[in-house]
Regions:
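Metal-dependent active-site segment of extracytoplasmic phospho-/sulfohydrolases and closely related
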Residues: 209-249
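Transmembrane and membrane-interface helices of multi-pass
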Residues: 1-2
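A structural signal for short, well-ordered beta-strand segments and their strand-loop junctions
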Residues: 22, 57-60, 115-121, 175-176, ...
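Beta-strand elements within well-structured catalytic alpha/beta cores of enzymes
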Residues: 14-34, 50-53, 109, 173-179, ...
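Catalytic-adjacent loop/helix segments of enzymes that bind and process anionic phosphate/sulfate esters
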Residues: 83-220, 261-264, 275, 279-288, ...
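Short, solvent-exposed loop/turn segments at secondary-structure junctions
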Residues: 25-30, 55-56, 63-66, 80-82, ...
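A short acidic-Thr-Gly-centered motif at the start of a beta-strand
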Residues: 5-16, 221-223
Length: 340
């Protein structure tokens, strides 16, 4: 089965067990792209802030899949799913359970005595009401109905995070804080304001995301100076598209492809030793394998890294299928996944 690891990494024993903070801004494109292509935005103030705090910014980093659900399910399972080889039905699979119910990352954390907390802006990931694998979540199922699509209730993730942080200092903590800024251009053609207006809106929301991230990071460093902090986008902002569903029309345009798949990764390691031993991290699917092997000081787990490839669904009538859009080394690659 696709979820099974090729080694015993679920039994890995971490030598270093800092509190781990995963902050995920939706649709945050990588610093290496934001000055270029369709974005053309100077984000140096925030980039310099992270550098001054000691973060490593991983240039060229990208997601392996095009959406929040498809990307995060691969992130937390630490494996490729290839949209389950079903391009027409990919949106129907229950990716949510791989994010918040049961996954490899949660198993490893719990095996190392971590308490786990999920703090999110709205119930989008909770919408299918899966069982919770996290010890706590900031939104109650009583707050929304079974037919929830998008919107209310909206929680202030900063306030909820401040309430939750450091409640039990006796055991290591993992916090996954997810918020939907800067987000991406409109999903549908009918909702689009046109690519230029969509870009302007994305930049406005980027500024809000930067402010929130600064507040989150500053709060952590004040309360927990030995923290491990990860800023990890789920996918790109799709700036340059009129609407996100255009990604399912085949394109060879490098800047459009990277606008969808490029995403930010910045890590503040809890010690200079761990910072110096930080590996090169290229894509979402391998983030936690790299993280855990560094905390365990055990390089044997590099033998089963997943391919750093980005995969897309194409729904063009004549070319329908699942395509590798970006190859191992960042090259544009239009190889079609064999039908299975």
């Amino acid at each position: 089965e696709w979820k099974n690891q090729n080694d015993d990494i679920e039994q890995i024993e971490l030598i270093h067990r800092p509190n781990i903070y995963l902050f995920q801004p939706d649709g945050y494109v990588n610093f290496s792209e934001i000055n270029n292509g369709f974005y053309m935005y100077d984000n140096s103030v925030f980039e310099n802030y992270l550098t001054e705090k000691g973060f490593i910014n991983y240039d060229g980093f990208r997601s392996n899949y095009f959406s929040t659900l498809t990307s995060n399910s691969s992130l937390f399972m630490m494996k490729h799913h290839y949209y389950f080889f079903k391009p027409e039905r990919a949106d129907q699979f229950n990716y949510r359970k791989h994010i918040i119910t049961e996954n490899t990352v949660l198993s490893i954390l719990k095996n190392n005595n971590y308490q786990t907390h999920y703090i999110v802006e709205n119930p989008y990931i909770l919408a299918s009401v899966p069982a919770l694998g996290y010890d706590t979540v900031n939104i109650s199922y009583d707050e929304f109905g079974p037919l929830y699509q998008w919107g209310e209730p909206v929680h202030d993730v900063y306030e909820d995070f401040v309430t939750q942080i450091n409640q039990d200092p006796s055991t290591p903590q993992f916090y996954f804080v997810e918020f939907y800024k800067p987000a991406h251009v409109s999903v549908s053609k009918n909702g689009s304001k046109g690519k230029e207006k969509e870009r302007e809106q994305w930049i406005d929301q980027l500024k809000e995301a930067n402010n929130l991230l600064v507040n989150l990071v500053d709060t952590v460093l004040e309360k927990d100076p030995d923290a491990l902090i990860i800023i990890l986008g789920d996918h790109g902002g799709y700036v340059g598209f009129d609407y996100t569903k255009q990604i399912k029309t085949k394109t060879l345009d490098r800047d459009l492809i990277y606008s969808a798949f490029s995403t930010q990764l910045s890590i503040l390691w809890p010690s200079e030793k761990l910072k110096q031993s930080s590996p090169e991290i290229k894509s979402s699917v391998n983030v936690f394998r790299h993280l855990f092997l560094n905390l365990a000081e055990d390089s044997k787990y590099t033998k089963h890294l997943e391919p750093n490839e980005s995969w897309n669904i194409v729904l063009d009538e004549q070319e329908k299928g699942i395509y590798k859009y970006i190859g191992e080394n960042g090259e544009i690659d239009m190889s079609k996944l064999d039908d299975r």
